C-alpha cells in the first residue's frame, strides 16, 4: 500500500478559537503514524508561529511553543504563505518559533498539490 502524504493547513489565529490547538494535537498524533507530513500556515494561521506570545494574559493556554518541537517528531516540511505575511505587516525574516520555508501563493499551492490528504484547522 502506498504511503499517503498528509498536509495540515493552519488558517486561524492562535487565540479566540481552539482550531490551532486541535490541529496541533492532530498533527502530533498523525506524526506517530506517518513520516510524510507537510504543515502550511496561511491567512491568520501565520500568527501561530509568532514568538513571545502571552496567551495567559487573556486566560488562554500557551500551546504555541509546542510547534517548536515538531522536528523532534520528524515533521520538517513547514511552509508560510508570503502574501499572508505581507497582508499582516510581518517580515518573512522574523524569528519564527519553527524553521519554515516562505513560499509565494503559487508555490504554496503547487507544494500543497503534492499531498494526498489535506486537513484544515
UniProtKB/Swiss-Prot annotation:
Main location as per UniProt: cytoplasm
Keyword Ribosomal protein: no
Record GO biological process: tRNA processing
Gene Ontology CC: one annotated term: cytoplasm
SUPFAM superfamilies named in the record: DsrEFH-like (SSF75169)
Keywords: Cytoplasm, tRNA processing
Cellular localisation: Cytoplasm
Family classification: Belongs to the DsrF/TusC family.
Quaternary structure note: Heterohexamer, formed by a dimer of trimers. The hexameric TusBCD complex contains 2 copies each of TusB, TusC and TusD. The TusBCD complex interacts with TusE.
Purpose of the protein: Part of a sulfur-relay system required for 2-thiolation of 5-methylaminomethyl-2-thiouridine (mnm(5)s(2)U) at tRNA wobble positions.
This protein's name: Protein TusC
Organism, scientific name: Yersinia pestis
Amino acid at each position: 500500500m502506498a504511503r499517503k502524504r498528509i498536509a495540515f493547513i493552519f488558517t486561524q489565529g492562535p487565540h479566540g478559537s481552539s482550531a490551532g490547538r486541535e490541529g496541533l494535537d492532530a498533527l502530533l498524533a498523525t506524526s506517530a503514524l506517518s513520516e510524510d507530513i507537510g504543515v502550511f500556515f496561511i491567512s491568520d494561521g501565520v500568527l501561530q508561529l509568532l514568538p513571545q506570545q502571552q496567551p495567559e494574559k487573556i486566560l488562554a493556554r500557551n500551546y504555541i511553543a509546542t510547534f517548536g518541537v515538531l522536528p523532534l517528531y520528524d515533521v520538517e516540511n513547514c511552509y508560510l504563505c508570503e502574501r499572508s505575511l505581507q497582508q499582516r505587516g510581518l517580515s518573512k525574516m522574523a524569528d519564527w518559533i519553527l524553521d519554515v520555508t516562505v513560499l509565494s501563493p503559487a508555490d504554496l499551492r503547487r507544494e500543497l498539490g503534492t499531498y494526498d490528504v489535506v486537513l484544515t484547522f
